[in-house]
């Protein structure tokens, strides 16, 4: 009796260890494969991230080309519109930290930053995955960097309405307190990151 139980116990341990080794090796091969892939901008992207925004500077004025300004009537239904606009970073009045609770588990959320300007403009930055047509986002593959990184620049109306009206998510906004001049520095840093992604 005891000998058979010991044999069964160690058989289970060895089998579990073997399965774990096989799993880790498979994940490592997958990781190496994904790291060897070269990201690119010229692909058949889905409509909501079809264009990459580019920023250009002239003093405190920043010109933004390809800002998304969709009107959403559902999770996927929308009227496509991409605009070019200019903002003056000296006229930033507020920064809003946006938390999109997209899952029933409260700890899972997507975050964005919205910059409010004294001329009434609201520009939102959101780091997202860039998907090709027919490709679905998978959080597990996202952990292994299987998707191109995409910095979306959109009007706040677009970015928030997609989540509150289209996807029916709970969204919270918090005003960000920054030292003098840091709001402008943060906006410019995001634009620099935007341009660096556009060079890949």
Per-segment meaning from a language model:
Residues 62, 73-172:
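Glycine-rich catalytic cores of cysteine/serine-nucleophile enzymes that process amide/ester linkages
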Residues 57-61, 116-119, 181-185:
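A short, structured loop/turn motif at beta-sheet edges
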Residues 157-200:
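Active-site nucleophile-His-acid catalytic modules used for acyl/amide transfer and hydrolysis
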Residues 2-14:
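Hydrophobic alpha-helical transmembrane segments
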Residues 20-41:
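Membrane-interface motif at the C-terminal end of an N-terminal transmembrane signal
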Residues 13-21:
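Selective detector of the "anchor" transmembrane alpha-helix that sits immediately C-terminal
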Residues 47-83:
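Short extracytoplasmic
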Residues 34-54:
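Alpha-helical transmembrane signal-anchor/signal-peptide segments
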């Amino acid at each position: 009796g005891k000998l058979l139980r010991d044999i069964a116990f160690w058989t289970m341990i060895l089998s579990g260890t073997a399965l774990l080794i096989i799993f880790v090796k498979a994940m490592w091969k997958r990781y190496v494969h994904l790291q060897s892939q070269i990201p690119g901008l010229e692909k058949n992207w889905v409509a909501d991230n079809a264009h990459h925004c580019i920023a250009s500077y002239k003093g405190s004025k920043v010109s933004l080309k390809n800002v998304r300004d969709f009107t959403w009537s559902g999770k996927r239904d929308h009227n496509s519109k991409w605009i070019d606009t200019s903002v003056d970073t000296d006229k930033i009045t507020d920064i809003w930290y946006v938390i999109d609770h997209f899952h029933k588990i409260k700890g899972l959320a997507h975050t964005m930053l919205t910059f409010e300007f004294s001329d009434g403009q609201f520009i939102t930055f959101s780091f997202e995955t860039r998907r090709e047509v027919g490709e679905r986002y998978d959080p597990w593959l996202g952990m292994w960097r299987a998707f191109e990184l995409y910095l979306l620049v959109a009007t706040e109306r677009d970015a928030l309405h997609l989540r509150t009206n289209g996807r029916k998510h709970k969204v919270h906004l918090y005003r960000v307190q920054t030292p003098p001049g840091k709001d402008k520095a943060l906006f410019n840093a995001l634009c620099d990151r935007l341009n660096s992604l556009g060079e890949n």
